[in-house]
Amino acid sequence: MAALDASASFDASAIAKAQDETLAEAERLNLLPAPEKTPFENKYAARKLLQERCEVLQAALPGAGTTTPWVRALLGECEAALGDIGYDVEEPHAADPCYARALAALAPGAEALDDSGDHGDEDASEEARIQAAAADEETAEDIAVASAARVRDAALVGAPKHARGAELGAAALRALNGAAVLWQGREQPRRAFRLLKAAEALERLPSLPGGAGFSADTLREAETKTIYYLAQVCASLGDGAASANYCAQTLERQLVGPAPSFDGVTPLDWAKNCVGLARFFVDQGAVLDAMSCCRAGVAAARLDGVDDDPDEPRGSVVADAHKCWAQAHASRAESFIATRRTVATCTEKDAH
């Protein structure tokens, strides 16, 4: 493992190389099989490595000069990884300050978000709810723009050819998503929602001038996590329609491509989730969304391996999907007939 002598002259290339090596080794340790008697042993080793790296970066700051923003951003990258480890080893009290420091470094403004207000409050007027929702959207956009600018500016003054702009952008998303999961677990869903909306806004920025240059794979992975978490948070906030929409997006992302990924969930489970979501959309009158979910459910149910579950054969899931498909068509037909009747009535009145 490359190390940096704090007393040596500042060497940005050496710092970049050590950052690469440290984070790669920490990731390797995180992915090792967990020992049965000491399940967090490898994660503790990764945490120690990252903590030592933070100490080295802190020691490098006094001599960083014009590259100070870059070194601070590298610190934020390490803190985001430390936050994830703190959460994984069931120490949210340790994860919290790490995420806060990562957000302050990479997504300024996000660390100050709180759980106040609720634009889903039934007692609030419609105008008040609309204004609160608009304020949340504006805040999310502001944080996203500030984050992209922070990452861009840090990369511009970093080590030549080793600025890590894409990695720093990914770390910002990692901190936003991780902090959101943390606060959702602490029963502060509004705070989690605001963090996730900031992540969602940041993920839309790469195509805009000045956006952080994420790789396609990094961006897609982060987007899927954000959408998945938003589905849960919106459900906690009582926004069933938004939760269903994010669920549908999550399912779609898991099912597309030549090699569908279910993240440990069996294809049969995903098929049942799709059909359940389709029923919700039928009840809401969202017929096209219901049909899309039915198609996804059938596709998942027909993947190899689902017949291994004797208690829930794929045939019954496919049948449920077809039944829901029929209900969606019936709902669509009823809507069409009702519209025709309304038009006919209006035409008749106009004729008289």
For the regions a protein language model found, what residue spans apply to each?
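N-terminal alpha-helical scaffolding segments that mark the starts
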Residues: 1-56, 73
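Residues that mark the junctions of alpha-helical repeat units in TPR/alpha-solenoid scaffolds
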Residues: 18, 46, 68, 75, ...
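"A position-specific structural signal for the A-helix of alpha-solenoid helical repeats
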Residues: 20, 24, 74-77, 81, ...
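Amphipathic alpha-helical segments of tetratricopeptide repeats
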Residues: 54-62, 103-111, 160, 200-211, ...
